[in-house]
Curated annotation (Swiss-Prot):
The lineage of its organism: Viruses, Adnaviria, Zilligvirae, Taleaviricota, Tokiviricetes. This is Uncharacterized protein ORF48. It comes from Acidianus filamentous virus 1 (isolate United States/Yellowstone). It holds the Pfam family RHH_1. GO terms for biological process: regulation of DNA-templated transcription. It comes from the Viruses.
Amino acid sequence: MRVVTFKAEEELLALLDRYAMNKGLYRSEVIREAIIEFLSVRGYKVNG
């Protein structure tokens, strides 16, 4: 996998971290799942 950097508001990161902690996931896992879901519902086939 490649490393990707992006900017996000502090509030969004706080929510992301809280969700990840509650689910026992890493932040990157939550972001990957969110991107896959985003693309899938728009008709893109994602292998991952």
